[in-house]
Amino acid sequence: MILPFLVLAIGTCLTNSFVPEKEKDPSYWRQQAQETLKNALKLQKLNTNVAKNIIMFLGDGMGVSTVTAARILKGQLHHNTGEETRLEMDKFPFVALSKTYNTNAQVPDSAGTATAYLCGVKANEGTVGVSAATERTRCNTTQGNEVTSILRWAKDAGKSVGIVTTTRVNHATPSAAYAHSADRDWYSDNEMPPEALSQGCKDIAYQLMHNIKDIDVIMGGGRKYMYPKNRTDVEYELDEKARGTRLDGLDLISIWKSFKPRHKHSHYVWNRTELLALDPSRVDYLLGLFEPGDMQYELNRNNLTDPSLSEMVEVALRILTKNPKGFFLLVEGGRIDHGHHEGKAKQALHEAVEMDEAIGKAGTMTSQKDTLTVVTADHSHVFTFGGYTPRGNSIFGLAPMVSDTDKKPFTAILYGNGPGYKVVDGERENVSMVDYAHNNYQAQSAVPLRHETHGGEDVAVFAKGPMAHLLHGVHEQNYIPHVMAYASCIGANLDHCAWASSASSPSPGALLLPLALFPLRTLF
Protein backbone atom coordinates (compact mmCIF):
# COMPACT_ATOMS: atom_id res chain seq x y z
CA MET A 1 0.00 0.00 0.00
CA ILE A 2 1.32 3.47 -0.93
CA LEU A 3 0.63 6.16 1.65
CA PRO A 4 -1.33 9.26 0.47
CA PHE A 5 1.56 11.72 0.88
CA LEU A 6 3.77 9.44 -1.20
CA VAL A 7 1.12 9.22 -3.90
CA LEU A 8 0.99 13.02 -4.01
CA ALA A 9 4.79 13.35 -4.13
CA ILE A 10 5.16 10.70 -6.79
CA GLY A 11 2.31 12.08 -8.85
CA THR A 12 3.76 15.59 -8.79
CA CYS A 13 7.21 14.29 -9.75
CA LEU A 14 5.91 12.17 -12.61
CA THR A 15 3.68 14.96 -13.90
CA ASN A 16 6.68 17.25 -14.10
CA SER A 17 8.99 14.63 -15.61
CA PHE A 18 10.09 14.77 -19.22
CA VAL A 19 7.81 13.19 -21.83
CA PRO A 20 9.12 13.27 -25.44
CA GLU A 21 6.74 15.29 -27.60
CA LYS A 22 6.28 12.52 -30.17
CA GLU A 23 5.12 10.12 -27.47
CA LYS A 24 2.13 12.33 -26.68
CA ASP A 25 0.65 11.42 -30.06
CA PRO A 26 -1.19 8.04 -30.05
CA SER A 27 -0.12 7.44 -33.65
CA TYR A 28 3.49 7.10 -32.50
CA TRP A 29 2.67 4.09 -30.36
CA ARG A 30 0.33 2.55 -32.94
CA GLN A 31 2.92 2.84 -35.71
CA GLN A 32 5.61 1.38 -33.45
CA ALA A 33 3.39 -1.57 -32.56
CA GLN A 34 2.51 -2.20 -36.22
CA GLU A 35 6.19 -2.26 -37.19
CA THR A 36 6.87 -4.73 -34.40
CA LEU A 37 3.94 -6.83 -35.60
CA LYS A 38 5.27 -6.90 -39.18
CA ASN A 39 8.66 -8.07 -37.93
CA ALA A 40 7.03 -10.76 -35.80
CA LEU A 41 5.04 -12.06 -38.77
CA LYS A 42 8.27 -12.47 -40.74
CA LEU A 43 9.41 -14.99 -38.13
CA GLN A 44 6.93 -17.50 -39.55
CA LYS A 45 9.66 -18.26 -42.09
CA LEU A 46 12.10 -20.13 -39.88
CA ASN A 47 15.84 -20.05 -40.45
CA THR A 48 16.69 -23.74 -40.70
CA ASN A 49 20.13 -23.31 -42.23
CA VAL A 50 23.12 -25.10 -40.78
CA ALA A 51 24.97 -22.84 -38.38
CA LYS A 52 28.47 -22.76 -39.80
CA ASN A 53 29.45 -20.49 -36.91
CA ILE A 54 28.34 -20.22 -33.28
CA ILE A 55 28.95 -17.24 -31.00
CA MET A 56 27.93 -17.45 -27.37
CA PHE A 57 27.92 -14.25 -25.32
CA LEU A 58 27.76 -14.90 -21.60
CA GLY A 59 27.07 -11.99 -19.29
CA ASP A 60 28.21 -13.27 -15.92
CA GLY A 61 25.55 -12.22 -13.42
CA MET A 62 23.51 -10.44 -16.09
CA GLY A 63 20.02 -11.02 -14.72
CA VAL A 64 16.94 -9.38 -16.20
CA SER A 65 17.15 -6.38 -13.86
CA THR A 66 20.74 -5.84 -15.02
CA VAL A 67 19.69 -6.02 -18.67
CA THR A 68 16.99 -3.41 -18.12
CA ALA A 69 19.25 -1.07 -16.15
CA ALA A 70 22.01 -1.45 -18.77
CA ARG A 71 19.50 -0.55 -21.48
CA ILE A 72 18.63 2.67 -19.67
CA LEU A 73 22.30 3.46 -19.06
CA LYS A 74 23.17 2.91 -22.71
CA GLY A 75 20.47 5.35 -23.75
CA GLN A 76 21.52 7.92 -21.18
CA LEU A 77 25.14 7.68 -22.31
CA HIS A 78 23.80 8.79 -25.71
CA HIS A 79 21.94 11.71 -24.09
CA ASN A 80 18.50 10.09 -24.30
CA THR A 81 16.05 9.35 -21.51
CA GLY A 82 17.15 5.72 -21.76
CA GLU A 83 14.03 3.62 -21.30
CA GLU A 84 13.19 3.55 -25.01
CA THR A 85 16.71 2.45 -26.02
CA ARG A 86 17.28 -0.92 -27.64
CA LEU A 87 20.27 -3.00 -26.67
CA GLU A 88 21.82 -5.11 -29.41
CA MET A 89 20.48 -8.20 -27.65
CA ASP A 90 17.00 -6.62 -27.61
CA LYS A 91 17.00 -6.86 -31.40
CA PHE A 92 17.31 -10.66 -31.37
CA PRO A 93 14.06 -12.26 -32.58
CA PHE A 94 13.90 -15.18 -30.16
CA VAL A 95 13.92 -15.00 -26.37
CA ALA A 96 13.66 -17.74 -23.75
CA LEU A 97 14.19 -18.19 -20.04
CA SER A 98 16.83 -20.42 -18.48
CA LYS A 99 16.50 -22.18 -15.12
CA THR A 100 19.86 -21.71 -13.46
CA TYR A 101 19.91 -23.92 -10.37
CA ASN A 102 22.84 -26.30 -9.82
CA THR A 103 22.25 -29.95 -8.97
CA ASN A 104 22.97 -29.18 -5.31
CA ALA A 105 22.13 -25.47 -5.13
CA GLN A 106 18.90 -23.52 -5.49
CA VAL A 107 20.90 -20.33 -6.08
CA PRO A 108 23.82 -21.31 -8.32
CA ASP A 109 27.44 -20.37 -8.81
CA SER A 110 29.22 -19.65 -12.09
CA ALA A 111 31.04 -22.99 -12.29
CA GLY A 112 28.10 -25.36 -12.13
CA THR A 113 26.16 -23.13 -14.49
CA ALA A 114 29.05 -22.97 -16.98
CA THR A 115 29.13 -26.75 -17.05
CA ALA A 116 25.42 -26.68 -17.88
CA TYR A 117 25.44 -24.17 -20.75
CA LEU A 118 28.74 -25.38 -22.23
CA CYS A 119 28.76 -29.13 -21.56
CA GLY A 120 25.04 -29.86 -21.63
CA VAL A 121 24.72 -31.42 -18.17
CA LYS A 122 23.92 -29.84 -14.83
CA ALA A 123 26.56 -30.12 -12.14
CA ASN A 124 27.35 -29.31 -8.54
CA GLU A 125 28.21 -25.83 -7.35
CA GLY A 126 31.91 -25.03 -7.65
CA THR A 127 32.80 -27.78 -10.15
CA VAL A 128 33.65 -27.37 -13.84
CA GLY A 129 33.55 -29.82 -16.73
CA VAL A 130 32.38 -32.73 -14.59
CA SER A 131 29.05 -34.37 -13.83
CA ALA A 132 27.19 -34.14 -10.54
CA ALA A 133 28.95 -37.33 -9.46
CA THR A 134 31.98 -35.15 -8.72
CA GLU A 135 31.94 -33.49 -5.30
CA ARG A 136 33.56 -30.12 -4.81
CA THR A 137 37.18 -30.21 -3.54
CA ARG A 138 37.30 -34.02 -3.79
CA CYS A 139 39.86 -34.76 -6.48
CA ASN A 140 39.27 -38.50 -6.28
CA THR A 141 35.68 -38.09 -7.51
CA THR A 142 36.78 -36.52 -10.80
CA GLN A 143 38.08 -39.43 -12.86
CA GLY A 144 35.42 -41.03 -14.99
CA ASN A 145 33.00 -38.15 -14.46
CA GLU A 146 34.47 -35.71 -16.98
CA VAL A 147 32.11 -34.16 -19.52
CA THR A 148 33.15 -32.39 -22.71
CA SER A 149 32.03 -28.99 -23.94
CA ILE A 150 30.68 -27.54 -27.14
CA LEU A 151 34.11 -26.00 -27.69
CA ARG A 152 35.54 -29.53 -27.85
CA TRP A 153 32.70 -30.70 -30.10
CA ALA A 154 33.37 -27.82 -32.49
CA LYS A 155 37.11 -28.46 -32.56
CA ASP A 156 36.54 -32.16 -33.21
CA ALA A 157 34.36 -31.16 -36.17
CA GLY A 158 37.24 -29.20 -37.69
CA LYS A 159 36.07 -25.76 -36.68
CA SER A 160 38.23 -23.04 -35.20
CA VAL A 161 37.49 -22.19 -31.57
CA GLY A 162 38.10 -19.23 -29.31
CA ILE A 163 37.64 -17.91 -25.79
CA VAL A 164 37.46 -14.20 -24.97
CA THR A 165 36.79 -13.01 -21.43
CA THR A 166 37.23 -10.00 -19.18
CA THR A 167 38.07 -12.28 -16.26
CA ARG A 168 41.16 -14.44 -16.00
CA VAL A 169 41.12 -17.14 -18.68
CA ASN A 170 41.08 -19.86 -16.01
CA HIS A 171 38.05 -18.45 -14.22
CA ALA A 172 34.78 -20.37 -13.81
CA THR A 173 33.08 -19.56 -17.11
CA PRO A 174 35.94 -20.15 -19.58
CA SER A 175 37.35 -23.11 -17.64
CA ALA A 176 34.25 -25.24 -18.25
CA ALA A 177 35.07 -25.07 -21.97
CA TYR A 178 38.31 -27.04 -21.58
CA ALA A 179 38.91 -28.19 -17.98
CA HIS A 180 37.62 -30.91 -15.66
CA SER A 181 38.05 -29.83 -12.07
CA ALA A 182 36.50 -30.66 -8.71
CA ASP A 183 37.11 -27.07 -7.66
CA ARG A 184 36.81 -23.89 -9.69
CA ASP A 185 39.36 -22.18 -7.42
CA TRP A 186 42.26 -24.41 -8.47
CA TYR A 187 43.58 -21.67 -10.77
CA SER A 188 47.18 -22.92 -10.47
CA ASP A 189 48.81 -25.63 -8.39
CA ASN A 190 49.47 -22.96 -5.75
CA GLU A 191 45.75 -22.93 -4.91
CA MET A 192 45.41 -26.72 -4.72
CA PRO A 193 45.53 -28.76 -1.49
CA PRO A 194 48.36 -31.32 -1.17
CA GLU A 195 45.84 -34.16 -1.23
CA ALA A 196 44.51 -33.14 -4.64
CA LEU A 197 48.04 -32.82 -6.04
CA SER A 198 49.04 -36.22 -4.69
CA GLN A 199 45.95 -37.78 -6.26
CA GLY A 200 46.99 -36.50 -9.68
CA CYS A 201 44.55 -33.67 -10.27
CA LYS A 202 45.83 -30.81 -12.41
CA ASP A 203 45.17 -27.12 -11.94
CA ILE A 204 42.98 -25.25 -14.41
CA ALA A 205 45.76 -23.16 -16.01
CA TYR A 206 47.69 -26.36 -16.70
CA GLN A 207 44.60 -27.92 -18.25
CA LEU A 208 44.08 -24.87 -20.46
CA MET A 209 47.42 -25.52 -22.13
CA HIS A 210 47.24 -29.32 -22.22
CA ASN A 211 43.65 -30.56 -22.57
CA ILE A 212 42.85 -28.93 -25.92
CA LYS A 213 46.21 -27.83 -27.25
CA ASP A 214 44.88 -26.25 -30.43
CA ILE A 215 42.42 -23.66 -29.15
CA ASP A 216 42.89 -21.00 -31.80
CA VAL A 217 42.22 -17.85 -29.76
CA ILE A 218 42.51 -17.29 -26.01
CA MET A 219 42.19 -13.76 -24.62
CA GLY A 220 41.61 -12.35 -21.16
CA GLY A 221 43.53 -11.96 -17.91
CA GLY A 222 45.42 -14.45 -15.76
CA ARG A 223 49.15 -14.04 -16.54
CA LYS A 224 50.35 -14.84 -13.04
CA TYR A 225 48.92 -18.35 -13.09
CA MET A 226 51.07 -19.21 -16.10
CA TYR A 227 54.46 -18.42 -14.53
CA PRO A 228 56.67 -19.92 -11.78
CA LYS A 229 56.28 -18.69 -8.22
CA ASN A 230 57.52 -15.11 -7.71
CA ARG A 231 58.27 -14.47 -11.40
CA THR A 232 58.05 -10.68 -11.82
CA ASP A 233 55.15 -9.50 -13.95
CA VAL A 234 56.02 -7.73 -17.20
CA GLU A 235 53.66 -4.84 -16.47
CA TYR A 236 53.56 -4.52 -12.68
CA GLU A 237 57.18 -5.12 -11.75
CA LEU A 238 56.88 -3.85 -8.17
CA ASP A 239 53.56 -5.50 -7.33
CA GLU A 240 54.14 -8.72 -5.40
CA LYS A 241 50.52 -9.81 -5.90
CA ALA A 242 51.08 -9.77 -9.67
CA ARG A 243 53.98 -12.23 -9.53
CA GLY A 244 53.85 -15.79 -10.79
CA THR A 245 52.08 -18.36 -8.64
CA ARG A 246 53.12 -21.77 -9.96
CA LEU A 247 54.82 -24.16 -7.54
CA ASP A 248 55.77 -26.65 -10.27
CA GLY A 249 58.11 -24.13 -11.92
CA LEU A 250 56.39 -24.40 -15.29
CA ASP A 251 56.25 -21.54 -17.76
CA LEU A 252 52.92 -22.33 -19.39
CA ILE A 253 53.24 -19.61 -22.00
CA SER A 254 56.46 -21.18 -23.29
CA ILE A 255 54.71 -24.55 -23.24
CA TRP A 256 51.82 -23.05 -25.23
CA LYS A 257 54.28 -21.84 -27.85
CA SER A 258 56.04 -25.20 -28.02
CA PHE A 259 52.79 -27.01 -28.83
CA LYS A 260 52.15 -24.97 -31.98
CA PRO A 261 53.19 -26.37 -35.37
CA ARG A 262 56.25 -24.65 -36.83
CA HIS A 263 54.49 -23.88 -40.09
CA LYS A 264 51.75 -21.99 -38.24
CA HIS A 265 51.89 -18.42 -37.00
CA SER A 266 51.34 -18.24 -33.24
CA HIS A 267 51.49 -15.02 -31.24
CA TYR A 268 51.51 -14.23 -27.54
CA VAL A 269 50.64 -10.63 -26.62
CA TRP A 270 50.21 -8.94 -23.25
CA ASN A 271 49.00 -5.43 -24.09
CA ARG A 272 46.57 -3.60 -26.34
CA THR A 273 49.27 -2.09 -28.54
CA GLU A 274 50.67 -5.50 -29.42
CA LEU A 275 47.19 -6.90 -30.02
CA LEU A 276 46.07 -4.18 -32.40
CA ALA A 277 49.39 -4.30 -34.27
CA LEU A 278 48.73 -7.89 -35.33
CA ASP A 279 47.65 -8.72 -38.85
CA PRO A 280 44.87 -11.27 -38.22
CA SER A 281 45.30 -12.69 -41.71
CA ARG A 282 48.75 -13.88 -40.62
CA VAL A 283 47.74 -15.24 -37.21
CA ASP A 284 46.80 -18.88 -36.72
CA TYR A 285 46.97 -19.04 -32.93
CA LEU A 286 46.67 -16.16 -30.49
CA LEU A 287 47.19 -16.05 -26.73
CA GLY A 288 46.53 -12.66 -25.15
CA LEU A 289 46.90 -12.23 -21.39
CA PHE A 290 46.45 -8.58 -20.51
CA GLU A 291 46.45 -8.62 -16.70
CA PRO A 292 47.97 -10.79 -13.94
CA GLY A 293 44.45 -11.55 -12.69
CA ASP A 294 41.11 -10.36 -14.00
CA MET A 295 41.08 -7.54 -16.51
CA GLN A 296 40.34 -4.01 -15.35
CA TYR A 297 36.79 -2.73 -15.21
CA GLU A 298 35.83 -0.91 -18.40
CA LEU A 299 35.58 2.38 -16.48
CA ASN A 300 39.13 1.89 -15.15
CA ARG A 301 40.69 0.49 -18.31
CA ASN A 302 44.05 1.81 -19.51
CA ASN A 303 43.69 2.40 -23.24
CA LEU A 304 47.38 1.78 -23.82
CA THR A 305 47.67 -1.59 -22.12
CA ASP A 306 44.19 -3.12 -21.95
CA PRO A 307 41.94 -3.78 -24.95
CA SER A 308 38.20 -3.46 -24.62
CA LEU A 309 35.96 -6.49 -24.93
CA SER A 310 34.78 -5.21 -28.31
CA GLU A 311 38.35 -4.95 -29.56
CA MET A 312 39.17 -8.48 -28.43
CA VAL A 313 36.04 -9.82 -30.11
CA GLU A 314 36.88 -8.08 -33.38
CA VAL A 315 40.41 -9.52 -33.48
CA ALA A 316 39.14 -12.97 -32.51
CA LEU A 317 36.55 -12.98 -35.28
CA ARG A 318 39.06 -11.84 -37.91
CA ILE A 319 41.19 -14.85 -37.01
CA LEU A 320 38.43 -17.42 -36.61
CA THR A 321 36.46 -16.54 -39.75
CA LYS A 322 39.35 -17.69 -41.93
CA ASN A 323 38.35 -21.32 -41.36
CA PRO A 324 35.99 -22.44 -44.16
CA LYS A 325 34.45 -24.98 -41.77
CA GLY A 326 33.40 -22.23 -39.38
CA PHE A 327 34.04 -21.53 -35.72
CA PHE A 328 32.78 -21.50 -32.14
CA LEU A 329 33.52 -18.44 -30.03
CA LEU A 330 32.76 -18.03 -26.33
CA VAL A 331 32.69 -14.40 -25.19
CA GLU A 332 32.28 -13.58 -21.51
CA GLY A 333 31.47 -10.23 -20.00
CA GLY A 334 32.73 -11.58 -16.73
CA ARG A 335 33.12 -8.50 -14.62
CA ILE A 336 29.43 -7.65 -14.58
CA ASP A 337 29.37 -10.24 -11.83
CA HIS A 338 32.30 -8.73 -9.96
CA GLY A 339 30.77 -5.27 -9.97
CA HIS A 340 27.60 -6.62 -8.42
CA HIS A 341 29.46 -8.68 -5.81
CA GLU A 342 31.23 -5.50 -4.73
CA GLY A 343 27.96 -3.57 -4.67
CA LYS A 344 29.34 -1.28 -7.38
CA ALA A 345 26.37 -1.06 -9.71
CA LYS A 346 27.98 1.58 -11.92
CA GLN A 347 30.91 -0.71 -12.67
CA ALA A 348 28.60 -3.67 -13.31
CA LEU A 349 26.29 -1.79 -15.66
CA HIS A 350 29.12 -0.25 -17.69
CA GLU A 351 30.49 -3.78 -18.11
CA ALA A 352 27.10 -4.87 -19.43
CA VAL A 353 26.95 -1.96 -21.87
CA GLU A 354 30.43 -2.82 -23.15
CA MET A 355 29.37 -6.42 -23.70
CA ASP A 356 26.41 -5.17 -25.68
CA GLU A 357 28.82 -3.15 -27.81
CA ALA A 358 30.75 -6.37 -28.46
CA ILE A 359 27.51 -8.08 -29.48
CA GLY A 360 26.92 -5.30 -31.98
CA LYS A 361 30.45 -5.60 -33.32
CA ALA A 362 30.02 -9.34 -33.86
CA GLY A 363 26.73 -8.68 -35.62
CA THR A 364 28.39 -6.44 -38.18
CA MET A 365 31.07 -9.04 -38.87
CA THR A 366 28.81 -12.08 -39.30
CA SER A 367 25.57 -13.05 -41.01
CA GLN A 368 22.40 -14.50 -39.53
CA LYS A 369 22.27 -16.82 -42.53
CA ASP A 370 25.10 -18.99 -41.23
CA THR A 371 25.88 -17.75 -37.70
CA LEU A 372 23.90 -18.67 -34.60
CA THR A 373 24.40 -16.08 -31.87
CA VAL A 374 23.18 -16.76 -28.34
CA VAL A 375 23.30 -14.22 -25.51
CA THR A 376 22.54 -15.28 -21.96
CA ALA A 377 23.64 -15.16 -18.34
CA ASP A 378 24.76 -17.84 -15.95
CA HIS A 379 22.76 -16.43 -13.05
CA SER A 380 21.29 -13.24 -11.68
CA HIS A 381 22.09 -11.04 -8.67
CA VAL A 382 20.07 -9.53 -5.83
CA PHE A 383 20.22 -6.23 -7.72
CA THR A 384 17.14 -4.11 -8.21
CA PHE A 385 16.05 -0.61 -9.11
CA GLY A 386 12.75 1.07 -8.35
CA GLY A 387 11.18 3.74 -6.19
CA TYR A 388 8.74 5.20 -8.73
CA THR A 389 11.49 7.11 -10.53
CA PRO A 390 10.29 9.45 -13.30
CA ARG A 391 11.06 9.00 -16.96
CA GLY A 392 14.68 9.85 -17.76
CA ASN A 393 15.81 9.72 -14.14
CA SER A 394 19.52 8.92 -13.97
CA ILE A 395 19.81 5.19 -13.48
CA PHE A 396 22.28 5.99 -10.70
CA GLY A 397 20.11 8.74 -9.24
CA LEU A 398 17.82 9.13 -6.26
CA ALA A 399 14.24 7.95 -6.08
CA PRO A 400 11.75 10.88 -6.01
CA MET A 401 10.75 10.28 -2.40
CA VAL A 402 12.10 9.68 1.05
CA SER A 403 11.50 6.68 3.23
CA ASP A 404 8.26 6.92 5.19
CA THR A 405 10.09 5.21 8.06
CA ASP A 406 13.43 6.95 8.54
CA LYS A 407 12.64 10.06 6.43
CA LYS A 408 15.85 9.68 4.42
CA PRO A 409 16.28 9.58 0.63
CA PHE A 410 17.42 6.47 -1.21
CA THR A 411 18.89 5.64 -4.59
CA ALA A 412 16.82 3.88 -7.23
CA ILE A 413 19.42 1.11 -7.31
CA LEU A 414 19.58 -1.11 -4.24
CA TYR A 415 20.83 -4.59 -3.34
CA GLY A 416 19.14 -7.24 -1.25
CA ASN A 417 22.43 -7.88 0.51
CA GLY A 418 26.06 -6.84 0.20
CA PRO A 419 28.75 -4.43 1.38
CA GLY A 420 26.60 -1.31 0.95
CA TYR A 421 24.86 -1.76 4.29
CA LYS A 422 25.97 1.26 6.31
CA VAL A 423 24.83 2.60 9.67
CA VAL A 424 25.76 6.15 10.72
CA ASP A 425 24.97 7.24 14.28
CA GLY A 426 22.68 4.26 14.66
CA GLU A 427 20.68 5.03 11.52
CA ARG A 428 20.74 4.28 7.80
CA GLU A 429 23.25 6.45 6.00
CA ASN A 430 21.83 9.56 4.35
CA VAL A 431 22.81 9.02 0.71
CA SER A 432 22.27 12.68 -0.15
CA MET A 433 25.46 13.33 1.82
CA VAL A 434 27.63 11.04 -0.33
CA ASP A 435 28.66 10.89 -3.99
CA TYR A 436 26.27 8.18 -5.14
CA ALA A 437 27.27 8.77 -8.78
CA HIS A 438 30.91 7.80 -8.11
CA ASN A 439 32.23 4.88 -10.16
CA ASN A 440 32.92 2.87 -7.02
CA TYR A 441 29.90 3.89 -4.96
CA GLN A 442 28.47 0.86 -3.16
CA ALA A 443 24.70 0.97 -3.31
CA GLN A 444 22.83 0.41 -0.08
CA SER A 445 21.82 -3.12 0.80
CA ALA A 446 19.21 -4.58 3.13
CA VAL A 447 21.52 -7.17 4.71
CA PRO A 448 25.23 -6.64 5.50
CA LEU A 449 27.57 -9.00 3.66
CA ARG A 450 31.17 -8.54 2.56
CA HIS A 451 30.18 -9.75 -0.89
CA GLU A 452 26.74 -9.46 -2.43
CA THR A 453 25.21 -12.77 -3.53
CA HIS A 454 23.79 -14.26 -6.68
CA GLY A 455 20.05 -14.32 -7.32
CA GLY A 456 18.12 -17.49 -8.02
CA GLU A 457 15.56 -16.37 -10.60
CA ASP A 458 15.55 -17.41 -14.25
CA VAL A 459 17.71 -15.50 -16.72
CA ALA A 460 16.98 -14.49 -20.30
CA VAL A 461 18.33 -16.22 -23.41
CA PHE A 462 18.44 -14.17 -26.62
CA ALA A 463 19.04 -15.93 -29.95
CA LYS A 464 19.33 -15.14 -33.66
CA GLY A 465 20.47 -17.11 -36.68
CA PRO A 466 20.02 -20.74 -37.75
CA MET A 467 17.66 -22.72 -35.49
CA ALA A 468 17.39 -19.85 -33.02
CA HIS A 469 13.67 -20.62 -32.73
CA LEU A 470 14.53 -23.72 -30.71
CA LEU A 471 15.17 -21.35 -27.82
CA HIS A 472 11.55 -20.46 -27.27
CA GLY A 473 10.20 -21.02 -23.76
CA VAL A 474 11.38 -21.91 -20.28
CA HIS A 475 14.31 -24.32 -20.46
CA GLU A 476 16.78 -26.03 -18.21
CA GLN A 477 20.10 -24.26 -18.63
CA ASN A 478 21.84 -27.39 -19.91
CA TYR A 479 19.52 -27.39 -22.96
CA ILE A 480 21.39 -24.46 -24.51
CA PRO A 481 24.51 -26.26 -25.86
CA HIS A 482 22.34 -29.02 -27.27
CA VAL A 483 20.53 -26.44 -29.38
CA MET A 484 23.80 -24.90 -30.53
CA ALA A 485 25.22 -28.31 -31.41
CA TYR A 486 22.04 -29.31 -33.24
CA ALA A 487 22.11 -26.12 -35.28
CA SER A 488 25.75 -26.66 -36.23
CA CYS A 489 25.65 -30.44 -36.75
CA ILE A 490 28.37 -31.16 -34.20
CA GLY A 491 28.79 -33.34 -31.15
CA ALA A 492 25.89 -35.73 -30.62
CA ASN A 493 24.09 -34.13 -33.56
CA LEU A 494 26.59 -34.92 -36.29
CA ASP A 495 24.73 -37.98 -37.55
CA HIS A 496 21.30 -36.42 -37.99
CA CYS A 497 22.65 -33.84 -40.44
CA ALA A 498 24.39 -36.52 -42.46
CA TRP A 499 21.16 -38.53 -42.49
CA ALA A 500 19.10 -35.58 -43.67
CA SER A 501 21.61 -34.78 -46.40
CA SER A 502 21.83 -38.32 -47.77
CA ALA A 503 18.09 -38.94 -47.52
CA SER A 504 16.91 -36.02 -49.57
CA SER A 505 20.00 -34.09 -50.72
CA PRO A 506 18.40 -30.77 -49.77
CA SER A 507 19.89 -27.40 -50.42
CA PRO A 508 22.15 -26.16 -47.63
CA GLY A 509 19.54 -23.64 -46.60
CA ALA A 510 17.02 -26.38 -45.88
CA LEU A 511 19.36 -29.00 -44.50
CA LEU A 512 17.92 -29.08 -41.01
CA LEU A 513 14.25 -28.55 -41.82
CA PRO A 514 13.14 -32.21 -41.71
CA LEU A 515 14.79 -32.73 -38.34
CA ALA A 516 13.65 -29.40 -36.96
CA LEU A 517 10.09 -30.68 -36.99
CA PHE A 518 10.84 -33.75 -34.86
CA PRO A 519 10.77 -33.63 -31.05
CA LEU A 520 14.27 -32.91 -29.78
CA ARG A 521 14.06 -35.76 -27.31
CA THR A 522 14.44 -38.20 -30.20
CA LEU A 523 17.82 -36.72 -31.07
CA PHE A 524 19.75 -36.92 -27.79
Swiss-Prot record:
SMART domains: alkPPc. Glycans are attached at N140, N230, N271, N303, N430. Binds 1 Mg(2+) ion. Binds 2 Zn(2+) ions. Its EC number is 3.1.3.1, 3.9.1.1. Pfam families: Alk_phosphatase. Residues 502-524 form a propeptide. Alkaline phosphatase that metabolizes various phosphate compounds and plays a key role in skeletal mineralization and adaptive thermogenesis. Has broad substrate specificity and can hydrolyze a considerable variety of compounds: however, only a few substrates, such as diphosphate (inorganic pyrophosphate; PPi), pyridoxal 5'-phosphate (PLP) and N-phosphocreatine are natural substrates. This is Alkaline phosphatase, tissue-nonspecific isozyme. It comes from Rattus norvegicus (Rat).
